[in-house]
């Protein structure tokens, strides 16, 4: 069979992917999201066993074009209909819903669901006829519409923390900067006296930044029941296809709260750790009067200090596996970071690592009169519940 060419989207398409609630079968959605991503789409992946409310809230906060769900657990009629109803109820009926579930979803049920308003449910026959890439081409083509090409009165709804308004202004700034220019100017004026702090979290890829952010958010929400938190999480775009896997939400368990707004951004440029729209996104969330805004970059290299331009206080996350101590002398962030977390502290050699990093931090910051043990370097295990190192870092 001849290999099909991927459809090339005309707009920046963002799609939320997940496997349905009580569904542990994530092999299918993983294959689909990889093909969707290689077709040039920014994929916000949630993993498996995700509730309708979680998926819908994500799609609204992320201003997605569509939702793609696999459902192999038999509850698809209720799941998809409830998702359609909830999107309508929340005023986000423009978000399209696609699904699939192999032979679990009967042909008669597919007809019923599509009549109800689901954009398309793919059957095994579609896979045979169209091929995998053909199905994804159809999905992406139907989801390929502009978002943010016009703004109405969104700015008036920011202070109500309306996720649709926040999301739409950020999308407009990303996709149609000319359309958003006037609104952003007004937002800058609004924010002149805004003092919401912006902690920036950066570090190497795979160091556990998202898990660490999740732990900080969980502690913040339980310590301050009245306060709200905004998150901006950046992941890299692929240079070859323009697609991106915005996968930070997979690790976030504490963000499903009405007090949290999270937005994932793709860098949309290669070899940089931040999107050039980060500053605008921060301003929009500040205007929505969130009490604290956490900015998380994509994985960075040794020489990257981009986060410093956007944050008030910076945390550098690394692991004990940095090689020889001389490698630390090359890491630019150790010159600038206010705090350093050595995550995955249960790995071998962690105690030697923290000693070396503390000494390097002392050298870089010329803190010769302070005991190296007092340097703001913390050993953390973000994947462990109530980890003492995480507690110490949070209090710092």
Regions found by a protein language model. Give the residues of each.
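Extreme N-terminal, non-catalytic leader segments
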Residues: 132-198
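Canonical P-loop GTPase G-domain recognition
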Residues: 112-136, 140, 335-396
């Amino acid at each position: 069979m001849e290999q099909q060419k991927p459809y090339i989207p005309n707009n920046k398409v963002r799609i939320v992917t997940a496997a349905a609630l009580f569904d542990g079968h994530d092999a299918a959605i993983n294959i689909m999201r990889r093909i969707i991503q290689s077709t040039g789409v920014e994929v916000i992946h949630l993993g498996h066993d995700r509730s309708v409310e979680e998926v819908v809230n994500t799609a609204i906060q992320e201003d997605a074009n569509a939702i793609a769900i696999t459902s192999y657990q038999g509850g698809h009629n209720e799941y998809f209909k409830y998702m359609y109803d909830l999107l309508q109820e929340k005023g986000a009926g423009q978000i399209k819903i696609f699904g699939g579930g192999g032979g679990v979803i009967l042909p008669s049920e597919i007809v019923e669901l599509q009549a109800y308003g689901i954009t398309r449910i793919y059957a095994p026959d579609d896979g045979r006829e169209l091929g995998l890439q053909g199905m994804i081409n159809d999905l992406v083509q139907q989801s390929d519409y502009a978002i943010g090409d016009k703004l109405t009165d969104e700015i008036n709804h920011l202070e109500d923390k309306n996720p649709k308004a926040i999301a739409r202004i950020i999308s407009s700034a990303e996709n149609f900067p000319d359309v958003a220019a006037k609104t952003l100017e007004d937002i800058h004026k609004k924010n002149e006296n805004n003092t919401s702090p912006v902690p920036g979290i950066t570090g190497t890829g795979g160091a556990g930044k998202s898990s660490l952010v999740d732990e900080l958010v969980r502690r913040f929400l339980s310590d301050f029941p009245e306060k709200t938190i905004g998150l901006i999480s950046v992941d890299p775009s692929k240079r070859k296809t323009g697609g991106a896997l915005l996968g930070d939400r997979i690790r976030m368990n504490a963000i499903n709260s009405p007090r949290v707004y999270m937005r994932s951004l793709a860098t949309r440029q290669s070899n940089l750790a931040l999107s050039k729209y980060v500053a605008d996104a921060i301003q929009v969330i500040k205007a929505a009067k969130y009490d604290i805004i956490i900015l998380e970059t994509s994985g960075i290299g040794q020489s990257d200090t981009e986060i410093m331009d956007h944050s008030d206080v910076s945390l550098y996350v690394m692991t004990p596996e940095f090689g020889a101590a001389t490698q630390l002398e090359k890491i630019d962030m150790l010159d600038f970071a206010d705090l350093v977390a050595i995550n995955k502290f249960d790995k071998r050699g962690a105690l030697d690592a923290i000693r070396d990093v503390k000494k390097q931090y002392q050298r870089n910051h010329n803190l010769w009169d302070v005991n190296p043990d007092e340097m703001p370097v913390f050993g953390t295990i973000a994947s462990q519940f109530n980890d003492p190192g995480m507690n110490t870092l949070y209090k710092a």
